[in-house]
UniProtKB/Swiss-Prot annotation:
It comes from Paramagnetospirillum magneticum (strain ATCC 700264 / AMB-1) (Magnetospirillum magneticum). Its EC number is 7.2.2.20. The lineage of its organism: Bacteria, Pseudomonadati, Pseudomonadota, Alphaproteobacteria, Rhodospirillales. This is Zinc import ATP-binding protein ZnuC. The gene is znuC. GO terms for biological process: response to zinc ion. The complex is composed of two ATP-binding proteins (ZnuC), two transmembrane proteins (ZnuB) and a solute-binding protein (ZnuA). One of its GO terms (cellular component) is plasma membrane.
Length: 262
């Protein structure tokens, strides 16, 4: 069974259609990234996946035993005294083993904030703490809504590498919403382009050439993603498989820096 499977999901709010017949599957060790314009229903889709919103139609099956969630942001009232240590400890049912909080914060590059109050954290520090909190649960599925918001560029690369490592090295399934299209195209296994319905989905290279993707993001964005095209005698199927040109692999293409396949 997949870690997460959505089939034919429809959702309305206030008489407006938010999601229309959305299908999505997340398997162990796979990174699925949802992209789309503002108002496309991306965050709502994650909330349906988590069970925070009930769809009007369709099915949601969760095979994951433990889910780690990083929201787009979390606002904690300034009058609430809550230390980072306590905030992290609340994520797990039992008291964490000695040193585990420190290790997890160090992993996300935020070891220096353990003794501080949550309300005193910067936006980037808070996102790192939220990711640490999700990882403390030892999840088999990570659900991430813009996980690097407010983090500087160098820090973004570090956190995306960490997320990728969770999938590749530990078999964690990842469902992520991101506006960082360059990173998405480099690191993800499967892209879902959402605009209330699924406009297109598949391997990043395939999606980046799809007419509906181009219509949503424009040719300038598509041109800026040329770094992810390659100059070999093969192309890719929708699932990312390597195809000779004679089998529908498309035109010859060239690899850019950071490309992870040949």
């Amino acid at each position: 069974m997949s870690l997460l499977n959505l089939s034919g999901v429809r959702l309305s709010h206030g008489g407006h259609l938010v999601l229309d017949r959305v299908d999505l599957t997340v398997d162990a060790g796979r990174i699925i990234t949802v992209v789309g314009p503002n108002g496309a229903g991306k965050s709502s889709l994650l909330k349906v996946a988590l069970g925070l919103l009930r769809p009007d139609a369709g099915t949601v099956e969760r095979g994951a035993k433990v889910i780690g969630y990083v929201p787009q942001r979390l606002d904690i009232g300034r009058l609430l005294p809550l230390s980072v240590r306590r905030f992290l400890a609340m994520a797990v049912a039992e008291r964490p083993p000695a040193g585990r909080l420190e290790e997890t914060l160090d992993l996300v590059g935020a070891g220096h904030v353990l003794g501080r109050q949550v309300v005193d954290l910067s936006g980037g520090e808070m996102q790192r703490v939220l990711l640490a909190r999700a990882l403390l649960r030892r999840p088999d599925l990570l659900v991430l809504d813009e996980p690097v918001g407010g983090v500087d560029v160098a820090g973004q690369a570090e956190l995306y590498d960490l997320i990728t490592g969770q999938a590749r090295e530990h078999g964690v399934g990842v469902l992520m919403v991101s506006h960082d299209l360059h990173v998405v195209m480099a690191a993800t296994d499967h892209v879902v382009c959402l605009n209330r319905h699924v406009c297109c989905a598949g391997h990043p290279e395939t999606v980046s050439r799809h007419p509906e993707y181009l219509a949503l993001f424009g040719p300038r964005v598509a041109a800026s993603l040329a770094i992810y095209t390659h100059a070999h005698d093969h192309g890719h199927g929708a699932d990312g498989s390597v195809l000779p040109l004679a089998e529908g692999g498309g035109e010859p293409h060239t690899h850019g820096p950071g490309c992870r396949h040949g």
